[in-house]
């Protein structure tokens, strides 16, 4: 996926807006954007078109990822700002994953400084329009390492992940701590109490 993004012109410092469902391919997009040196901007997949337009115009992404059913309605605003648009659906299929077998498995990461921007998250907008909050690579790394130490997470742990992945706790806390500690993840796409209770039998952590 990193090769595909780079081939589309995504480079260090560019923003990639990801409005796709919770699936492992969306997580791959997050990791791929970090490898390319881009700024990852996850967006609530349930936002309306008008809400989405605001975030596009304000963040000015280079690439936008959404479900195929939304491409037609979002494309005009992307064309207006010169943003490329690709599809990714809940089953992991779409333009993002098409043709990956023809690309090299190895991607040399673009070097980034610890204070370079890694991710962009918007506030809820309770006092006005949502505002972009900037997270650096050092922000993400230091946060994950502190929590790994505080919670004593290691490779023997298995995390129940039942949160959305478009906000801090569901993406940066849960995913980063698991990846950096070597822990496993039981990935529940939509919260379901029966699935969560069943997962208790095989897990040591829940977020």
Residue ranges and their predicted role:
Residues 16, 33, 64, 117, ...:
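Conserved S/T- and glycine-rich ATP-binding loop of Class I adenylate-forming
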């Amino acid at each position: 996926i990193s090769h595909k993004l780079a081939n589309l012109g995504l480079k260090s410092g560019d923003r990639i807006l990801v409005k796709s469902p919770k699936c492992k391919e969306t997580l791959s997009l997050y990791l791929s954007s970090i490898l390319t040196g881009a700024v990852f901007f996850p967006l609530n997949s349930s936002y309306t078109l008008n809400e989405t337009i605001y975030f596009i115009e304000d963040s000015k992404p280079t690439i936008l990822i959404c479900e195929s059913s939304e491409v037609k309605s979002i494309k005009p605003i992307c064309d207006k700002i010169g943003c490329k648009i690709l599809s990714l659906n809940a089953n992991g299929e779409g333009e993002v994953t098409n043709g990956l077998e023809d690309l090299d498995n190895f991607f040399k990461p673009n070097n980034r400084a610890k204070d370079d921007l890694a991710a962009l998250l918007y506030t809820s907008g309770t006092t006005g329009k949502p505002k972009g909050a900037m997270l650096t690579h050092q922000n993400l790394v230091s946060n994950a390492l502190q929590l790994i130490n505080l919670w004593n997470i290691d490779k023997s742990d298995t995390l129940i992940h039942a949160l959305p992945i478009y906000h801090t706790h569901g993406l940066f806390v849960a995913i980063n701590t698991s990846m950096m500690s070597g822990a496993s993840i039981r990935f529940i796409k939509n919260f379901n109490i029966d699935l969560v209770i069943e997962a208790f039998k095989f897990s040591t952590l829940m977020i």
